[in-house]
């Protein structure tokens, strides 16, 4: 049976995992960094191969956000190594990040990553873990749909901005249809604060106020928007 999924805001379960880069202690080995853990159904499968190539091509973007990548599947380390070699030889892409080898599904069980009807098969899950080891975001994709790496980067950047500013980001940030690249100010908690904020911020009403985000954060976030079809579909 699949394990209980760690909830947003909870600590990532402590465990030692085995990867093709050697053992890793989670979350301690990544303390001070953001971590994206993502599971895939199996090595040597077409959709998973496209995902790993996509993650590898954006690896430097993740590094700029102080973020490490960590893959996971129920394959063993030998399979991971051979798959990476195949990707390098056939597609000329180096996979620079480690992959957890979890042939018994023990790690996937702890993280709730097993497909409920697929036996020991990992789903396409994404966990974003902050520098303190807390789970901050969780994404799940069906087996027949590959992940969008641009959106994972945008989500990661938005989490970092909201932590820094104590604000929230609107839909489609940093290009929202209503407030553009601004961030949302949390609602007032007193009548006096509600009156004051109408003079302090740009507001549609006292409960809907917004302000500019730092320009450098906005520009970086825009790089992680889904790239136009003209660029992606060349």
Curated annotation (Swiss-Prot):
Under the heading NCBIfam families, the entry gives:
PRK13189.1
Q: Which reaction does it catalyse?
A: a hydroperoxide + [thioredoxin]-dithiol = an alcohol + [thioredoxin]-disulfide + H2O
Recorded family membership: Belongs to the peroxiredoxin family. Prx6 subfamily.
- State how it assembles: Homodecamer. Pentamer of dimers that assemble into a ring structure.
Q: Which cysteine pairs make disulfide bonds?
A: 203-209
Further information? The active site is a conserved redox-active cysteine residue, the peroxidatic cysteine (C(P)), which makes the nucleophilic attack on the peroxide substrate. The peroxide oxidizes the C(P)-SH to cysteine sulfenic acid (C(P)-SOH), which then reacts with another cysteine residue, the resolving cysteine (C(R)), to form a disulfide bridge. The disulfide is subsequently reduced by an appropriate electron donor to complete the catalytic cycle.
Its name, as the record gives it, is Peroxiredoxin
A GO biological process this protein is involved in? hydrogen peroxide catabolic process
Origin superkingdom: Archaea
* Residues noted as binding substrate in the record, renumbered to the chain: 124
């Amino acid at each position: 049976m699949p394990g209980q999924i760690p909830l947003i805001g909870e600590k990532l379960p402590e465990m030692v995992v085995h990867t093709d880069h050697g053992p890793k202690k989670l979350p301690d080995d990544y303390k001070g960094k953001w971590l994206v853990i993502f599971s895939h159904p199996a090595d040597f499968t077409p959709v998973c191969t496209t995902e790993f190539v996509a993650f590898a091509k954006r690896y430097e973007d993740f590094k700029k956000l102080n973020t490490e990548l960590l893959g996971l599947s129920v394959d063993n380390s030998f399979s991971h190594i051979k798959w990476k070699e195949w990707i390098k030889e056939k597609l000329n892409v180096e996979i620079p990040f480690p992959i957890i080898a979890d042939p018994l599904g023990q790690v996937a069980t702890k993280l709730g990553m097993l497909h409920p009807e697929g036996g020991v098969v990992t789903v396409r899950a994404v966990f974003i873990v902050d520098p303190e080891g807390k789970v901050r975001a969780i994404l799940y994709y069906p087996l027949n749909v590959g992940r969008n790496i641009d959106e994972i980067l945008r989500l990661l950047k938005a989490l970092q901005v909201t932590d820094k500013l104590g604000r929230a980001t609107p839909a489609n940030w940093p290009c929202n249809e209503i407030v553009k690249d601004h961030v949302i100010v949390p609602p007032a908690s007193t009548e006096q604060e509600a009156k004051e904020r109408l003079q302090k911020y740009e507001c549609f009403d006292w409960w809907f106020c917004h302000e500019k985000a730092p320009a450098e954060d906005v520009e970086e976030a825009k790089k992680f928007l889904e790239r136009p079809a003209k660029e992606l579909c060349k």
